[in-house]
A protein has these predicted regions:
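Conserved N-terminal phosphate-binding loop of PLP-dependent enzymes in the Aspartate aminotransferase
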Residues: 1-302
Length: 302
């Protein structure tokens, strides 16, 4: 496919078709569990299960067939899985748009186990977290989890060309027969070659290891900024965020505007959080320059 949203839509279709043909769920009764504060794209079906008014307002009527539960809440997942018509659990290993919310250790592995016990597909949306961003090739690798369906995009082509992908074993993937699904530019030779080259660079230049090491540096230096405006630093690898406490009438948006004036681009998400996802090829020197700008910009308001 081309975009992350298109890949998510494909995964939803694949999951539903599998549930009817393999699991035996009655026709048109399949449900997919999703999480509060999710972000999986902007198509009508995907915004149908969003909890963000900015994403779904005025776009109804919405697509049915989704159960939304709190993120990082295993008891809630276990309860939702009691429904015999649940076909899949669609989850971000780290919620990026929500403000880089990293779940508790063991959440993903236990969630995958619960899904397996109920014959429910564990679907990992790694469009934001995949391809070395979090310090592993996949964020699921931090807990040695192999998803039943894996969704990739963005970095799979190094940001050069629109490429996305859905991966699954044959038992799942082959429920869709030739002619039952397609994408105008999906699988085109240029896109495929670009993705292959990008993955070779990730491997050869050890970008996952770089992200892991530089992520520790970034979080350490951000925590060293002495400012009451920064109430929390969190992240994994080179996917990080700070939580901003409004101070003297200034908020996260004002901090971003000041950073722009000082030479660094970032944006707030969910109001009080600023996300930092620098290029995986960033040097430590450049990273320290970014931290200096962040500290200088925040100091303007305190």
């Amino acid at each position: 496919m081309n975009t992350g949203a298109e890949a998510v839509e494909t995964a939803i279709k694949l999951c539903r078709k599998w549930s009817y043909l393999k699991k035996g769920i009655p026709e048109n009764q399949a449900k997919i569990i999703v999480c509060d504060n999710n972000f999986h794209g902007r198509t009508t079906t995907i915004v149908s299960f969003s909890s963000d008014p900015d994403a779904y307002s005025d776009y109804g009527p919405f697509t049915p067939g989704f159960i939304r539960i709190p993120y990082d809440d295993l008891p809630a997942l276990e309860k939702a899985l009691e429904d015999p018509n649940v076909a899949g659990f669609l989850v971000e290993p780290i919620q990026g748009e929500a403000g880089v919310y990293v779940p508790a250790d063991g959440y993903l592995s236990r969630a995958a186990e619960l899904c397996k016990a109920r014959n429910v597909l564990f679907i990992a949306d790694e469009v934001q977290t995949g391809i070395a961003r979090t310090g592993r090739l996949l964020a699921c690798d931090h807990e040695s989890v192999k998803p039943d369906i894996l969704i990739l995009g963005k970095a799979i082509s190094g940001g050069l060309y629109p490429v996305s992908a859905v991966l699954a074993d044959d038992d799942i993937m082959l429920v869709i027969k030739p002619g039952q699904h397609g994408s105008t530019f999906g699988g085109n030779p240029v896109g495929a070659k670009v993705a292959m080259a990008a993955l070779e660079v990730v491997k050869d230049e050890k970008l996952a290891e770089r992200a892991e090491n530089l992520g520790h540096v970034l979080r350490r230096e951000l925590r060293a900024i002495n400012s009451p405006m920064i109430t929390l630093v969190r992240g994994r690898g080179l996917l990080n965020a700070i939580v901003i406490k409004p101070t003297n009438g200034r908020e996260a948006w004002d901090v971003c505007l000041e950073m722009k004036e000082n030479g660094l681009l970032a944006k707030p998400t969910h109001g009080d959080k600023i996300r930092f996802a620098p290029p995986l090829v960033i040097t430590e020197e450049q990273l320290m320059e970014c931290v200096e700008i962040i500290g200088k910009s925040i100091a303007t308001f305190c």
